[in-house]
Regions:
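An extracytoplasmic/periplasmic, membrane-proximal ligand-sensing/linker region
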Residues: 4, 8, 156, 161, ...
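A bilobed periplasmic-binding-protein/Venus flytrap-type ligand-binding module shared by bacterial periplasmic
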Residues: 120-131, 223-237
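Ligand-binding "clamshell"
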Residues: 84-112, 190-193, 204-218
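Soluble extramembrane regions of membrane proteins in the secretory/endomembrane system
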Residues: 113-114, 169, 199-201, 216, ...
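Beta->alpha turn/N-cap motifs
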Residues: 54-58, 68-81, 96, 181, ...
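Accessory recognition modules or surfaces
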Residues: 19-22, 35, 61-72, 76-77
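Short, low-complexity disordered leader/linker segments with a strong preference
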Residues: 1-21
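Bilobed "Venus flytrap"/periplasmic-binding protein-like clamshell domains
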Residues: 21-51, 55, 116-186, 190, ...
Length: 283
């Protein structure tokens, strides 16, 4: 009777759960939680079981996709180019794309395709402040940068991209302050700084009505969002078929608004995901 039941339960507790068909991963920021949710949903709707591993660091998730402990996640071309390939040049958006895809192939990682949006660094200002100073591009900052203050996330001012921007435009700001990301946006919104290094699909760009400045000298890298798959997952035609529908399906603005729902409006990832699915141009 009861003893048998206890023994039974004890044994049952020792049986490992079967591994999900696919492990979907993501890094620790809103856009990545949304994209991991999207990948998982697409695979689940196709009948696969999925485990999500969220909040993984860049280097960790990249290692995991190479050795197959993770099957799929969304990466950015600029991250692979600068961090994993350690390249300091900027051959432009297409040059980076092809360089990155080729490099990943050698690493046993398959590029399923590009999602359609890019989340790159851009210098941004309050629209009214930019108008007041007559600024629409980084070139317009050259004569006035020495009187302006700039804010960035914790790493931008230490990156090759900033050094390239500084050198190509031959300018520097009077003050350079670093902030936690959300505080960086508040700082520019509240006029504590004139310019920030924004992320182009960040919802706060829309919420605070920031103007993204053009970069005519191509100082800043392209960061196309790309779906990466492990060798094992990529060898399964149905898996590739399912994710192929996501290629070129998400415009920048749709991603920005989905991020805004979470970061500004306080909605759940689920709500943002539903919104995004409604905005997608499915193949």
């Amino acid at each position: 009777g009861i003893t048998a039941m206890i023994v039974c339960l004890a044994l049952y507790g020792l049986i490992p759960k079967p591994r999900a068909d696919f492990v979907v991963a993501g890094k620790p920021f809103t856009e990545q939680y949304i994209m991991a949710g999207l990948l998982a949903q697409e695979l689940e709707e196709a009948g696969f079981s999925v485990e999500q591993r969220l909040g993984m660091g860049s280097a960790v998730v990249y290692e995991a996709i190479r050795n197959g402990t993770v099957d799929v996640y969304v990466e950015y071309t600029g991250t692979v180019w600068a961090n994993f390939m350690s390249r300091e040049s900027n051959p432009g958006r297409q040059g980076i794309r092809s360089g990155v895809v080729g490099f990943l192939e050698e690493q046993n990682v398959t590029t399923v395709g590009f999602t359609g949006f890019q989340n790159r660094y851009a210098l941004a200002m309050r629209r009214d402040r930019a108008l007041e100073l007559g600024v629409t591009s980084i070139e317009d900052l050259i004569p006035i940068a020495a009187e302006l203050s700039a804010g960035s996330d914790l790493e931008f001012f230490g990156r090759t991209e900033w050094f390239r921007l500084r050198d190509l435009y031959n300018m520097d700001f009077a003050d350079k302050l670093t902030f936690d990301v959300s505080l960086m946006y508040t700082a520019v919104a509240e006029r504590q700084v004139d310019v920030i290094s924004a992320y182009t699909t960040d919802g706060r760009v829309a919420a605070y009505d920031l103007l993204l400045l053009d970069d005519p000298r191509n100082a800043l890298l392209a960061y196309d969002a790309m779906i990466l798959a492990s060798a094992n997952a990529a060898a399964q035609p149905k898996f590739m078929q399912v994710l192929d529908t996501l290629v070129d399906s998400i415009p920048d603005e749709a991603m920005r608004q989905a991020n805004r729902l979470v970061d500004v409006d306080g909605e759940s990832i689920t709500v943002a995901l539903e919104y995004l699915r409604g905005e997608m141009t499915k193949n």
